[in-house]
Protein backbone atom coordinates (compact mmCIF):
# COMPACT_ATOMS: atom_id res chain seq x y z
CA UNK A 1 0.00 0.00 0.00
CA UNK A 2 2.83 2.41 0.82
CA UNK A 3 5.32 1.16 -1.77
CA UNK A 4 5.69 4.32 -3.84
CA UNK A 5 6.49 7.67 -2.26
CA UNK A 6 6.37 10.88 -4.26
CA UNK A 7 8.05 14.15 -3.27
CA UNK A 8 5.79 17.15 -3.92
CA UNK A 9 7.69 20.04 -2.29
CA UNK A 10 11.34 20.44 -1.33
CA UNK A 11 12.17 23.80 0.21
CA UNK A 12 14.32 25.63 2.74
CA UNK A 13 12.55 26.96 5.83
CA UNK A 14 13.71 29.48 8.41
CA UNK A 15 11.28 28.92 11.28
CA UNK A 16 11.39 27.78 14.03
CA UNK A 17 15.05 27.45 13.01
CA UNK A 18 16.69 26.83 9.60
CA UNK A 19 15.83 23.43 8.13
CA UNK A 20 14.83 21.66 4.95
CA UNK A 21 11.20 20.59 4.56
CA UNK A 22 10.37 17.75 2.22
CA UNK A 23 6.67 17.17 1.60
CA UNK A 24 5.26 14.18 -0.20
CA UNK A 25 2.64 11.47 -0.39
CA UNK A 26 2.22 7.77 -1.01
CA UNK A 27 0.85 7.02 -4.45
CA UNK A 28 -2.60 5.49 -4.49
CA UNK A 29 -3.42 6.62 -0.94
CA UNK A 30 -4.56 9.77 0.82
CA UNK A 31 -1.56 9.59 3.18
CA UNK A 32 0.98 12.39 3.00
CA UNK A 33 4.09 13.21 5.01
CA UNK A 34 6.64 15.86 5.91
CA UNK A 35 10.33 15.47 6.69
CA UNK A 36 12.04 18.29 8.58
CA UNK A 37 15.82 18.01 8.09
CA UNK A 38 18.35 20.03 10.13
CA UNK A 39 21.42 21.53 8.46
CA UNK A 40 24.29 19.07 8.06
CA UNK A 41 26.27 20.75 10.84
CA UNK A 42 23.45 20.00 13.31
CA UNK A 43 22.40 16.52 12.23
CA UNK A 44 23.63 13.75 14.52
CA UNK A 45 22.50 10.72 12.55
CA UNK A 46 19.02 10.17 13.99
CA UNK A 47 15.35 10.80 13.27
CA UNK A 48 12.17 11.15 15.32
CA UNK A 49 8.74 9.87 14.20
CA UNK A 50 5.77 11.55 15.86
CA UNK A 51 2.50 9.62 15.53
CA UNK A 52 -1.19 10.16 16.24
CA UNK A 53 -4.23 8.53 14.57
CA UNK A 54 -5.95 11.62 13.18
CA UNK A 55 -3.13 14.16 12.86
CA UNK A 56 -2.21 15.90 9.64
CA UNK A 57 1.33 15.81 8.32
CA UNK A 58 2.24 19.38 9.32
CA UNK A 59 4.20 19.42 12.56
CA UNK A 60 3.90 22.27 15.04
CA UNK A 61 6.91 24.56 15.51
CA UNK A 62 7.68 23.25 19.01
CA UNK A 63 7.95 19.67 17.73
CA UNK A 64 10.11 20.70 14.78
CA UNK A 65 12.33 22.86 16.96
CA UNK A 66 12.81 20.08 19.51
CA UNK A 67 13.88 17.58 16.86
CA UNK A 68 16.30 20.03 15.25
CA UNK A 69 17.74 21.01 18.64
CA UNK A 70 18.18 17.30 19.40
CA UNK A 71 20.20 16.62 16.25
CA UNK A 72 17.33 14.72 14.61
CA UNK A 73 15.19 15.11 11.57
CA UNK A 74 11.46 14.84 12.21
CA UNK A 75 8.98 12.67 10.32
CA UNK A 76 5.28 13.39 10.58
CA UNK A 77 2.77 11.34 8.57
CA UNK A 78 -0.93 12.08 8.28
CA UNK A 79 -2.85 9.91 10.70
CA UNK A 80 -3.66 6.28 10.00
CA UNK A 81 -4.43 3.20 12.05
CA UNK A 82 -1.32 1.31 13.05
CA UNK A 83 2.30 2.01 12.20
CA UNK A 84 2.78 0.86 8.60
CA UNK A 85 2.60 4.27 6.93
CA UNK A 86 5.07 5.66 9.46
CA UNK A 87 7.45 2.75 8.89
CA UNK A 88 7.23 3.25 5.12
CA UNK A 89 7.94 6.97 5.52
CA UNK A 90 10.98 6.22 7.69
CA UNK A 91 12.37 3.78 5.13
CA UNK A 92 11.78 6.22 2.30
CA UNK A 93 13.55 8.98 4.23
CA UNK A 94 16.72 6.85 4.41
CA UNK A 95 16.75 6.52 0.63
CA UNK A 96 16.99 10.27 0.06
CA UNK A 97 19.36 11.35 2.85
CA UNK A 98 22.37 11.26 0.54
CA UNK A 99 20.74 14.06 -1.45
CA UNK A 100 21.01 16.36 1.56
CA UNK A 101 23.95 15.14 3.64
CA UNK A 102 27.48 14.38 2.45
CA UNK A 103 28.02 11.87 5.24
CA UNK A 104 25.22 9.42 6.03
CA UNK A 105 25.95 6.69 8.59
CA UNK A 106 25.28 3.08 7.70
CA UNK A 107 22.65 2.96 10.45
CA UNK A 108 20.42 5.96 11.09
CA UNK A 109 18.98 5.74 14.59
CA UNK A 110 15.21 6.05 14.78
CA UNK A 111 12.86 6.86 17.65
CA UNK A 112 9.07 6.86 17.62
CA UNK A 113 6.81 8.66 20.09
CA UNK A 114 3.15 9.45 20.52
CA UNK A 115 0.55 9.87 23.21
CA UNK A 116 -2.97 8.64 23.96
CA UNK A 117 -4.16 7.22 20.62
CA UNK A 118 -0.59 7.69 19.45
CA UNK A 119 0.59 5.37 22.22
CA UNK A 120 -1.34 2.56 20.54
CA UNK A 121 0.67 3.18 17.37
CA UNK A 122 3.95 3.53 19.24
CA UNK A 123 3.56 0.27 21.14
CA UNK A 124 2.33 -1.46 17.98
CA UNK A 125 5.45 -0.30 16.15
CA UNK A 126 7.76 -1.59 18.87
CA UNK A 127 6.07 -4.98 19.11
CA UNK A 128 5.56 -5.59 15.38
CA UNK A 129 8.61 -4.15 13.61
CA UNK A 130 12.37 -4.60 13.70
CA UNK A 131 15.07 -2.45 12.17
CA UNK A 132 13.00 0.71 11.74
CA UNK A 133 13.02 2.28 15.19
CA UNK A 134 15.62 1.68 17.90
CA UNK A 135 13.49 3.03 20.72
CA UNK A 136 10.14 4.49 21.66
CA UNK A 137 8.43 6.83 24.10
CA UNK A 138 4.74 5.94 24.51
CA UNK A 139 2.98 8.76 26.37
CA UNK A 140 -0.18 8.57 28.53
CA UNK A 141 -0.57 4.94 27.60
CA UNK A 142 -3.77 3.43 26.24
CA UNK A 143 -4.28 -0.33 26.56
CA UNK A 144 -6.77 -3.00 25.44
CA UNK A 145 -9.15 -1.88 28.23
CA UNK A 146 -8.95 1.90 27.81
CA UNK A 147 -11.35 3.08 25.11
CA UNK A 148 -14.29 3.51 25.67
CA UNK A 149 -14.35 1.99 29.17
CA UNK A 150 -12.40 4.77 30.91
CA UNK A 151 -14.88 7.36 29.71
CA UNK A 152 -17.87 5.21 30.66
CA UNK A 153 -16.98 4.87 34.34
CA UNK A 154 -15.82 8.47 34.56
CA UNK A 155 -19.10 9.77 33.17
CA UNK A 156 -21.12 7.44 35.40
CA UNK A 157 -19.42 8.80 38.50
CA UNK A 158 -19.60 12.44 37.45
CA UNK A 159 -23.32 12.13 36.66
CA UNK A 160 -24.01 10.74 40.13
CA UNK A 161 -21.64 13.05 42.02
CA UNK A 162 -22.49 16.27 40.21
CA UNK A 163 -24.46 17.76 43.11
CA UNK A 164 -21.56 17.09 45.50
CA UNK A 165 -18.84 18.45 43.23
CA UNK A 166 -18.12 21.52 45.38
CA UNK A 167 -17.54 19.34 48.48
CA UNK A 168 -15.19 17.06 46.56
CA UNK A 169 -13.23 19.93 45.03
CA UNK A 170 -12.81 21.72 48.35
CA UNK A 171 -11.67 18.58 50.17
CA UNK A 172 -9.00 17.91 47.55
CA UNK A 173 -7.74 21.49 47.54
CA UNK A 174 -7.48 21.44 51.32
CA UNK A 175 -5.41 18.27 51.13
CA UNK A 176 -7.95 16.06 52.90
CA UNK A 177 -9.98 13.93 50.48
CA UNK A 178 -11.66 12.13 53.37
CA UNK A 179 -13.52 15.36 54.21
CA UNK A 180 -15.79 14.76 51.24
CA UNK A 181 -16.85 11.27 52.24
CA UNK A 182 -19.39 12.15 55.00
CA UNK A 183 -21.21 14.35 52.50
CA UNK A 184 -21.83 11.45 50.10
CA UNK A 185 -24.87 9.21 50.20
CA UNK A 186 -24.46 5.43 50.13
CA UNK A 187 -25.05 5.37 46.36
CA UNK A 188 -22.69 8.28 45.73
CA UNK A 189 -19.95 6.73 47.86
CA UNK A 190 -20.38 3.40 46.08
CA UNK A 191 -20.04 4.96 42.63
CA UNK A 192 -17.09 7.06 43.77
CA UNK A 193 -15.37 3.85 44.89
CA UNK A 194 -16.28 2.12 41.62
CA UNK A 195 -14.55 4.91 39.70
CA UNK A 196 -11.57 4.82 42.07
CA UNK A 197 -11.11 1.06 41.72
CA UNK A 198 -11.46 1.44 37.97
CA UNK A 199 -8.55 3.87 37.99
CA UNK A 200 -9.93 7.41 37.97
CA UNK A 201 -7.28 9.32 39.97
CA UNK A 202 -8.90 10.64 43.14
CA UNK A 203 -7.16 14.02 42.97
CA UNK A 204 -8.28 14.47 39.36
CA UNK A 205 -11.79 15.20 40.67
CA UNK A 206 -10.57 18.68 41.59
CA UNK A 207 -11.16 19.47 37.91
CA UNK A 208 -14.69 18.13 38.15
CA UNK A 209 -15.99 19.83 35.02
CA UNK A 210 -13.23 18.20 32.98
CA UNK A 211 -14.08 14.73 34.24
CA UNK A 212 -17.79 15.40 33.72
CA UNK A 213 -17.31 16.26 30.05
CA UNK A 214 -19.22 13.77 27.92
CA UNK A 215 -17.63 14.77 24.62
CA UNK A 216 -15.47 11.67 24.23
CA UNK A 217 -18.21 9.28 25.34
CA UNK A 218 -20.42 10.66 22.57
CA UNK A 219 -17.58 10.46 20.05
CA UNK A 220 -17.02 6.80 20.94
CA UNK A 221 -20.69 5.80 20.68
CA UNK A 222 -20.43 4.92 17.00
CA UNK A 223 -17.54 2.51 17.62
CA UNK A 224 -19.51 0.60 20.24
CA UNK A 225 -22.62 0.57 18.05
CA UNK A 226 -20.62 -1.04 15.26
CA UNK A 227 -18.92 -3.58 17.53
CA UNK A 228 -21.81 -4.39 19.86
CA UNK A 229 -25.03 -3.22 18.16
CA UNK A 230 -27.48 -4.97 20.52
CA UNK A 231 -26.02 -3.54 23.73
CA UNK A 232 -28.45 -0.65 24.26
CA UNK A 233 -31.50 -2.83 23.60
CA UNK A 234 -30.19 -5.37 26.12
CA UNK A 235 -29.43 -2.62 28.64
CA UNK A 236 -33.03 -1.44 28.64
CA UNK A 237 -34.68 -4.87 28.52
CA UNK A 238 -32.63 -7.62 30.18
CA UNK A 239 -31.95 -8.41 33.84
CA UNK A 240 -28.51 -7.65 35.20
CA UNK A 241 -28.27 -4.29 33.45
CA UNK A 242 -28.91 -0.98 35.19
CA UNK A 243 -31.61 -0.19 32.63
CA UNK A 244 -33.93 -2.77 34.22
CA UNK A 245 -32.76 -2.26 37.79
CA UNK A 246 -34.94 -0.76 40.51
CA UNK A 247 -32.38 1.16 42.56
CA UNK A 248 -31.36 4.64 43.62
CA UNK A 249 -28.50 4.57 41.11
CA UNK A 250 -30.91 3.68 38.33
CA UNK A 251 -33.22 6.51 39.37
CA UNK A 252 -30.37 9.04 39.40
CA UNK A 253 -28.93 8.07 36.04
CA UNK A 254 -32.25 7.62 34.29
CA UNK A 255 -33.53 11.01 35.41
CA UNK A 256 -31.44 12.21 32.47
CA UNK A 257 -33.13 9.82 30.01
CA UNK A 258 -35.12 11.29 27.11
CA UNK A 259 -37.33 9.38 24.68
CA UNK A 260 -39.98 11.41 22.87
CA UNK A 261 -41.50 11.55 19.42
CA UNK A 262 -41.44 15.07 17.99
CA UNK A 263 -43.08 16.54 14.91
CA UNK A 264 -41.26 18.50 12.22
CA UNK A 265 -42.86 21.92 12.44
CA UNK A 266 -40.80 23.80 9.88
CA UNK A 267 -38.17 22.97 7.26
CA UNK A 268 -35.93 25.74 5.93
CA UNK A 269 -33.52 24.94 3.11
CA UNK A 270 -30.00 26.34 3.50
CA UNK A 271 -28.47 27.28 0.17
CA UNK A 272 -25.38 29.25 1.12
CA UNK A 273 -23.56 26.79 3.39
CA UNK A 274 -21.07 24.07 2.48
CA UNK A 275 -21.96 21.86 5.44
CA UNK A 276 -25.66 22.18 6.17
CA UNK A 277 -28.68 21.40 3.98
CA UNK A 278 -31.68 22.23 6.19
CA UNK A 279 -32.69 23.80 9.46
CA UNK A 280 -35.66 21.92 10.91
CA UNK A 281 -37.69 23.02 13.92
CA UNK A 282 -39.37 20.41 16.13
CA UNK A 283 -42.66 20.52 18.02
CA UNK A 284 -43.43 18.32 21.01
CA UNK A 285 -40.00 18.49 22.58
CA UNK A 286 -40.14 19.06 26.38
CA UNK A 287 -39.11 22.44 27.72
CA UNK A 288 -36.31 20.93 29.82
CA UNK A 289 -34.67 19.27 26.80
CA UNK A 290 -31.68 21.55 27.35
CA UNK A 291 -30.80 19.41 30.39
CA UNK A 292 -30.45 16.20 28.39
CA UNK A 293 -27.16 15.09 26.90
CA UNK A 294 -26.27 12.62 24.17
CA UNK A 295 -29.46 13.08 22.16
CA UNK A 296 -29.90 11.24 18.87
CA UNK A 297 -32.50 11.91 16.19
CA UNK A 298 -34.18 9.18 14.15
CA UNK A 299 -36.46 10.03 11.23
CA UNK A 300 -39.53 7.78 11.31
CA UNK A 301 -41.61 6.49 8.43
CA UNK A 302 -45.31 7.08 7.89
CA UNK A 303 -47.29 5.96 10.90
CA UNK A 304 -44.09 5.87 12.99
CA UNK A 305 -43.90 2.07 12.58
CA UNK A 306 -40.57 2.09 10.76
CA UNK A 307 -37.28 3.96 10.83
CA UNK A 308 -35.92 5.77 7.81
CA UNK A 309 -32.59 6.43 9.50
CA UNK A 310 -30.52 8.45 11.95
CA UNK A 311 -30.04 12.13 11.24
CA UNK A 312 -26.74 13.89 11.77
CA UNK A 313 -26.54 17.57 12.44
CA UNK A 314 -26.16 20.25 15.10
CA UNK A 315 -28.84 20.42 17.79
CA UNK A 316 -29.89 23.77 19.24
CA UNK A 317 -31.93 23.06 22.41
CA UNK A 318 -32.93 26.68 22.92
CA UNK A 319 -34.71 26.86 19.53
CA UNK A 320 -35.49 23.12 19.41
CA UNK A 321 -34.04 22.94 15.95
CA UNK A 322 -31.53 20.81 14.07
CA UNK A 323 -29.08 22.06 11.48
CA UNK A 324 -29.03 18.99 9.24
CA UNK A 325 -25.74 18.28 7.48
CA UNK A 326 -25.48 17.64 3.74
CA UNK A 327 -23.72 14.32 4.25
CA UNK A 328 -26.95 12.65 5.37
CA UNK A 329 -28.22 10.02 2.88
CA UNK A 330 -30.54 11.35 0.18
CA UNK A 331 -33.41 9.23 1.48
CA UNK A 332 -33.26 11.14 4.76
CA UNK A 333 -32.92 14.58 3.21
CA UNK A 334 -35.80 13.97 0.81
CA UNK A 335 -38.12 12.93 3.66
CA UNK A 336 -37.57 16.00 5.82
CA UNK A 337 -41.06 17.39 5.38
CA UNK A 338 -43.52 19.14 7.66
CA UNK A 339 -45.44 16.90 10.09
CA UNK A 340 -43.04 13.97 9.68
CA UNK A 341 -42.07 12.41 13.05
CA UNK A 342 -38.62 12.29 14.59
CA UNK A 343 -37.72 10.23 17.64
CA UNK A 344 -35.52 12.13 20.07
CA UNK A 345 -33.75 9.92 22.59
CA UNK A 346 -30.46 9.34 24.39
CA UNK A 347 -30.92 5.69 25.28
CA UNK A 348 -27.56 4.65 23.86
CA UNK A 349 -25.76 7.45 25.64
CA UNK A 350 -27.30 6.58 29.01
CA UNK A 351 -26.57 2.88 28.50
CA UNK A 352 -22.90 3.62 27.82
CA UNK A 353 -22.41 4.88 31.38
CA UNK A 354 -22.20 1.31 32.71
CA UNK A 355 -20.66 -0.40 29.68
CA UNK A 356 -17.46 -1.09 31.63
CA UNK A 357 -19.36 -3.39 33.99
CA UNK A 358 -20.07 -5.74 31.11
CA UNK A 359 -16.53 -5.80 29.71
CA UNK A 360 -14.35 -7.81 32.11
CA UNK A 361 -11.21 -8.59 30.07
CA UNK A 362 -10.52 -12.20 29.17
CA UNK A 363 -6.80 -11.61 29.75
CA UNK A 364 -5.50 -11.73 33.34
CA UNK A 365 -3.86 -8.86 35.18
CA UNK A 366 -6.35 -6.04 34.61
CA UNK A 367 -6.94 -5.62 38.32
CA UNK A 368 -9.21 -2.59 37.99
CA UNK A 369 -11.95 -5.00 36.89
CA UNK A 370 -11.65 -7.36 39.86
CA UNK A 371 -14.43 -5.39 41.59
CA UNK A 372 -16.89 -6.85 39.06
CA UNK A 373 -16.07 -10.46 39.93
CA UNK A 374 -18.04 -12.07 42.75
CA UNK A 375 -16.75 -14.30 45.57
CA UNK A 376 -17.53 -17.36 43.46
CA UNK A 377 -15.27 -16.12 40.67
CA UNK A 378 -18.17 -15.36 38.33
CA UNK A 379 -18.94 -11.90 36.89
CA UNK A 380 -21.43 -9.85 38.90
CA UNK A 381 -22.99 -8.46 35.71
CA UNK A 382 -23.80 -10.04 32.32
CA UNK A 383 -20.82 -9.96 29.99
CA UNK A 384 -20.90 -8.98 26.33
CA UNK A 385 -19.76 -11.37 23.62
CA UNK A 386 -17.44 -8.75 22.16
CA UNK A 387 -14.68 -6.96 24.08
CA UNK A 388 -14.98 -3.56 22.48
CA UNK A 389 -11.94 -1.91 24.06
CA UNK A 390 -9.68 -4.73 22.91
CA UNK A 391 -11.02 -4.40 19.37
CA UNK A 392 -10.45 -0.63 19.40
CA UNK A 393 -6.88 -1.15 20.58
CA UNK A 394 -6.21 -3.86 18.00
CA UNK A 395 -7.27 -1.58 15.17
CA UNK A 396 -5.41 1.46 16.46
CA UNK A 397 -2.11 -0.31 17.16
CA UNK A 398 -1.99 -2.17 13.87
CA UNK A 399 -2.80 -5.59 15.25
CA UNK A 400 -0.32 -5.87 18.11
CA UNK A 401 -1.23 -8.10 21.03
CA UNK A 402 0.22 -5.97 23.85
CA UNK A 403 2.34 -8.92 24.84
CA UNK A 404 5.34 -6.80 25.86
CA UNK A 405 7.78 -8.26 23.33
CA UNK A 406 9.35 -4.93 22.41
CA UNK A 407 12.13 -4.86 19.80
CA UNK A 408 13.96 -1.81 21.13
CA UNK A 409 14.33 0.29 24.23
CA UNK A 410 11.26 1.98 25.65
CA UNK A 411 10.55 4.78 28.13
CA UNK A 412 6.90 5.28 29.05
CA UNK A 413 5.83 8.71 30.27
CA UNK A 414 2.56 8.57 32.21
CA UNK A 415 0.67 11.11 34.30
CA UNK A 416 -0.91 10.64 37.71
CA UNK A 417 -3.86 13.03 37.20
CA UNK A 418 -4.87 11.47 33.89
CA UNK A 419 -8.56 10.57 33.87
CA UNK A 420 -8.51 9.59 30.18
CA UNK A 421 -5.63 7.10 30.26
CA UNK A 422 -5.67 5.70 33.79
CA UNK A 423 -2.20 5.55 35.43
CA UNK A 424 -2.47 1.87 36.41
CA UNK A 425 -2.75 0.89 32.74
CA UNK A 426 0.92 1.78 32.26
CA UNK A 427 1.74 -0.39 35.26
CA UNK A 428 -0.14 -3.26 33.60
CA UNK A 429 1.85 -2.89 30.38
CA UNK A 430 5.07 -2.72 32.38
CA UNK A 431 4.17 -6.14 33.82
CA UNK A 432 3.72 -7.52 30.29
CA UNK A 433 7.15 -6.29 29.22
CA UNK A 434 8.75 -7.56 32.43
CA UNK A 435 7.22 -11.00 31.99
CA UNK A 436 8.31 -11.23 28.36
CA UNK A 437 11.83 -9.77 28.57
CA UNK A 438 12.79 -11.37 31.87
CA UNK A 439 16.44 -10.63 32.65
CA UNK A 440 16.61 -8.11 29.77
CA UNK A 441 13.90 -5.91 31.28
CA UNK A 442 16.07 -3.34 33.11
CA UNK A 443 18.26 -2.88 30.05
CA UNK A 444 15.31 -2.05 27.83
CA UNK A 445 12.46 -0.46 29.77
CA UNK A 446 11.62 2.51 31.98
CA UNK A 447 8.32 3.85 33.32
CA UNK A 448 8.33 7.46 34.50
CA UNK A 449 5.25 8.75 36.29
CA UNK A 450 4.61 12.45 36.75
CA UNK A 451 2.37 14.07 39.33
CA UNK A 452 0.43 17.26 38.62
CA UNK A 453 0.06 16.29 34.94
CA UNK A 454 -3.08 15.35 33.03
CA UNK A 455 -3.77 13.89 29.58
CA UNK A 456 -3.95 16.44 26.81
CA UNK A 457 -0.98 17.92 24.94
CA UNK A 458 -2.40 21.43 24.60
CA UNK A 459 -0.97 24.28 26.71
CA UNK A 460 -2.47 24.38 30.19
CA UNK A 461 -5.65 26.47 30.33
CA UNK A 462 -5.47 29.59 32.48
CA UNK A 463 -7.99 28.28 35.01
CA UNK A 464 -5.93 25.09 35.55
CA UNK A 465 -2.47 26.55 36.08
CA UNK A 466 -2.70 26.00 39.84
CA UNK A 467 -3.71 22.37 39.25
CA UNK A 468 -1.59 20.85 36.47
CA UNK A 469 1.60 21.53 34.53
CA UNK A 470 2.48 21.29 30.86
CA UNK A 471 4.27 17.97 30.44
CA UNK A 472 5.76 18.50 26.97
CA UNK A 473 9.22 18.81 28.49
CA UNK A 474 8.78 15.49 30.28
CA UNK A 475 8.59 13.45 27.10
CA UNK A 476 11.22 15.63 25.43
CA UNK A 477 13.52 14.69 28.31
CA UNK A 478 12.58 11.04 27.77
CA UNK A 479 13.39 11.23 24.06
CA UNK A 480 16.86 12.65 24.72
CA UNK A 481 17.55 10.11 27.44
CA UNK A 482 16.42 7.38 25.06
CA UNK A 483 18.90 8.56 22.41
CA UNK A 484 21.75 8.51 24.91
CA UNK A 485 20.69 5.06 26.12
CA UNK A 486 20.52 3.53 22.65
CA UNK A 487 23.51 5.23 21.06
CA UNK A 488 25.97 5.61 23.93
CA UNK A 489 24.81 3.08 26.52
CA UNK A 490 24.11 5.80 29.09
CA UNK A 491 21.53 4.41 31.51
CA UNK A 492 18.56 6.76 32.01
CA UNK A 493 17.20 7.51 35.48
CA UNK A 494 15.52 4.52 37.08
CA UNK A 495 11.80 3.92 36.73
CA UNK A 496 9.55 5.73 39.17
CA UNK A 497 9.16 3.84 42.44
CA UNK A 498 5.51 3.48 43.37
CA UNK A 499 2.82 1.31 44.91
CA UNK A 500 -0.64 0.51 43.60
CA UNK A 501 -3.47 0.66 46.13
CA UNK A 502 -7.09 0.32 45.01
CA UNK A 503 -5.95 0.90 41.41
CA UNK A 504 -4.37 4.22 42.46
CA UNK A 505 -0.70 4.68 41.60
CA UNK A 506 1.07 6.20 44.61
CA UNK A 507 4.69 7.28 44.07
CA UNK A 508 7.34 7.13 46.79
CA UNK A 509 7.73 10.34 48.76
CA UNK A 510 11.43 11.25 48.66
CA UNK A 511 13.32 12.07 45.46
CA UNK A 512 16.11 9.57 46.19
CA UNK A 513 13.42 6.88 46.56
CA UNK A 514 11.02 7.96 43.82
CA UNK A 515 13.49 8.18 40.92
CA UNK A 516 12.01 9.06 37.52
CA UNK A 517 12.76 12.53 36.15
CA UNK A 518 10.24 14.87 37.76
CA UNK A 519 11.54 17.16 40.50
CA UNK A 520 9.80 16.83 43.85
CA UNK A 521 8.70 19.91 45.75
CA UNK A 522 7.72 20.23 49.40
CA UNK A 523 5.87 23.37 50.48
CA UNK A 524 4.90 24.32 54.03
CA UNK A 525 4.55 27.45 56.17
CA UNK A 526 5.71 28.36 59.64
CA UNK A 527 3.78 25.99 61.87
CA UNK A 528 3.02 28.54 64.58
CA UNK A 529 0.64 30.33 62.20
CA UNK A 530 -1.34 27.35 60.88
CA UNK A 531 -5.03 27.92 61.59
CA UNK A 532 -4.36 31.38 63.03
CA UNK A 533 -3.24 33.70 60.22
CA UNK A 534 -4.46 37.23 60.71
CA UNK A 535 -4.60 39.90 58.05
CA UNK A 536 -1.30 41.76 57.79
CA UNK A 537 0.70 38.91 59.34
CA UNK A 538 3.87 37.89 57.53
CA UNK A 539 3.80 34.25 56.50
CA UNK A 540 7.02 32.38 55.76
CA UNK A 541 6.65 29.74 53.06
CA UNK A 542 9.27 27.00 53.28
CA UNK A 543 10.10 25.25 50.03
CA UNK A 544 12.47 22.44 49.11
CA UNK A 545 12.81 21.30 45.48
CA UNK A 546 14.86 18.21 44.61
CA UNK A 547 15.70 16.83 41.18
CA UNK A 548 16.06 13.02 41.09
CA UNK A 549 19.53 11.60 40.43
CA UNK A 550 20.47 12.01 36.78
CA UNK A 551 17.39 14.10 35.97
CA UNK A 552 19.09 17.47 35.57
CA UNK A 553 18.95 20.58 37.75
CA UNK A 554 16.34 22.97 39.10
CA UNK A 555 16.47 26.01 36.80
CA UNK A 556 13.34 27.99 37.73
CA UNK A 557 11.10 28.69 40.74
CA UNK A 558 7.86 30.66 40.29
CA UNK A 559 5.27 31.70 42.88
CA UNK A 560 1.54 32.39 42.94
CA UNK A 561 0.65 33.42 46.49
CA UNK A 562 -2.92 34.54 45.83
CA UNK A 563 -4.24 31.71 43.68
CA UNK A 564 -4.71 33.97 40.68
CA UNK A 565 -2.95 31.52 38.34
CA UNK A 566 -0.30 34.14 37.62
CA UNK A 567 3.23 33.05 38.48
CA UNK A 568 6.13 35.35 39.28
CA UNK A 569 9.66 34.09 38.81
CA UNK A 570 11.95 34.36 41.83
CA UNK A 571 15.75 34.20 41.52
CA UNK A 572 17.52 31.65 43.71
CA UNK A 573 21.07 31.46 42.38
CA UNK A 574 22.66 28.97 39.99
CA UNK A 575 20.81 25.84 38.80
CA UNK A 576 21.19 23.05 41.33
CA UNK A 577 19.89 19.58 42.14
CA UNK A 578 18.46 20.87 45.43
CA UNK A 579 16.96 24.30 46.09
CA UNK A 580 15.84 25.44 49.57
CA UNK A 581 13.95 28.71 49.99
CA UNK A 582 12.14 30.56 52.75
CA UNK A 583 9.90 33.19 51.19
CA UNK A 584 7.85 35.73 53.19
CA UNK A 585 4.48 37.04 52.10
CA UNK A 586 1.80 39.23 53.71
CA UNK A 587 -1.93 38.65 53.12
CA UNK A 588 -3.84 41.90 53.52
CA UNK A 589 -7.34 40.58 52.85
CA UNK A 590 -9.16 37.81 54.71
CA UNK A 591 -10.03 34.75 52.67
CA UNK A 592 -8.95 31.29 51.61
CA UNK A 593 -6.00 31.16 49.24
CA UNK A 594 -4.17 28.38 47.43
CA UNK A 595 -0.48 29.27 47.46
CA UNK A 596 1.30 27.51 44.59
CA UNK A 597 4.97 27.23 43.71
CA UNK A 598 6.01 25.91 40.30
CA UNK A 599 9.46 24.43 39.94
CA UNK A 600 11.26 23.50 36.75
CA UNK A 601 14.15 21.15 36.17
CA UNK A 602 16.00 20.98 32.86
CA UNK A 603 17.75 17.84 31.66
CA UNK A 604 21.09 19.50 30.93
CA UNK A 605 20.74 22.10 33.69
CA UNK A 606 20.42 24.79 31.02
CA UNK A 607 18.13 27.56 32.27
CA UNK A 608 17.96 29.21 28.84
CA UNK A 609 16.78 26.13 26.94
CA UNK A 610 13.07 25.87 26.17
CA UNK A 611 13.25 22.09 25.72
CA UNK A 612 13.28 19.13 28.14
CA UNK A 613 12.02 21.29 31.00
CA UNK A 614 10.16 19.22 33.59
CA UNK A 615 7.70 20.96 35.91
CA UNK A 616 5.94 20.24 39.18
CA UNK A 617 3.72 22.15 41.59
CA UNK A 618 3.77 22.51 45.35
CA UNK A 619 0.51 23.72 46.91
CA UNK A 620 -0.76 24.69 50.32
CA UNK A 621 -4.09 26.16 51.34
CA UNK A 622 -3.91 29.35 53.41
CA UNK A 623 -6.85 30.60 55.48
CA UNK A 624 -6.54 34.28 56.47
CA UNK A 625 -8.92 35.65 59.10
Regions found by a protein language model. Give the residues of each.
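C-terminal His-loop and adjacent cap/lid subdomain of alpha/beta-hydrolase
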Residues: 1-625
